[in-house]
Curated annotation (Swiss-Prot):
Belongs to the UPF0200 family. ATP binds at G7, M8, P9, G10, S11, G12, K13, G14. Coiled coil: none annotated. Keywords: ATP-binding, Nucleotide-binding. Pfam families: AAA_17 (PF13207). This is UPF0200 protein TSIB_0920. One of its GO terms (molecular function) is ATP binding. It comes from Thermococcus sibiricus (strain DSM 12597 / MM 739). It comes from the Archaea.
Length: 190
């Protein structure tokens, strides 16, 4: 099973990855792939740099470029795991790339939604170098994400989790979804 976790920046995708990791499910981060590629190309990890690398990759390899780079990692993990989480898919082209590469696997999309204000607060605290430093940078990043097609993936998600509440409540929602997906608890402790 391939579980694609999608959502706008700061929506809470990473928390799903952490909780499913406690169930023994590994993950591949699409954002990490772009950051690694930026490092390889000598591009700074700023919002502008990350956007530039994302666009360059798509120009060079097609709209599913980041998925193409992720597929070997996913393939390797599926050799030893029943499921893999892919965090940060941005387009239906990327979803289709995973379906084409792994026709024997069920591909599930989980979308996470949080209000812009909540997401901005989270990103302001996160402190990653490519996080927006102002509300205008935040809005610009949202528009760039939507131009990649992220809204279409969210709209066609199999499951939607709203993350506006306390972390404990959000974790419970994630746990219930894992149970619905038939994922067995392995290392589940907090």
């Amino acid at each position: 099973m391939i579980i694609c976790v999608v959502g706008m920046p700061g929506s809470g995708k990473g928390q799903i990855v952490r909780i499913f990791g406690k169930y023994g499910i590994p993950h591949v981060s699409m954002g990490d792939i772009v950051r690694e590629e930026a490092d390889r190309r000598g591009v700074p990890r700023t919002p502008e740099g990350m956007n530039s690398v994302s666009i360059q990759l798509r120009q060079e390899l097609g709209d599913n470029a980041v998925a193409k780079l992720a597929i070997p990692k996913v393939r390797e993990l599926l050799k030893t795991h029943e499921a893999v989480i892919i965090e940060g898919v941005r387009s239906l082209d990327e979803i289709q790339a995973f379906k084409d590469a792994f026709p024997e696997e069920k591909v599930i999309i989980i979308a996470v939604h949080s209000s812009p204000q909540k997401r901005f607060e989270r990103l302001s605290k996160r402190g990653r170098s490519d996080d927006p430093k102002s509300w205008s940078e935040f809005e610009a990043r949202d528009w760039k994400e939507l131009k990649f097609g992220l809204g279409n993936v969210i709209a066609l998600a199999d499951y939607l989790i709203v993350n506006e509440s306390h972390l404990t409540q959000y974790r419970r929602k994630i746990e219930r979804l894992a149970e619905r997906l038939g994922i067995k608890k392995k290392y589940f402790t907090f």
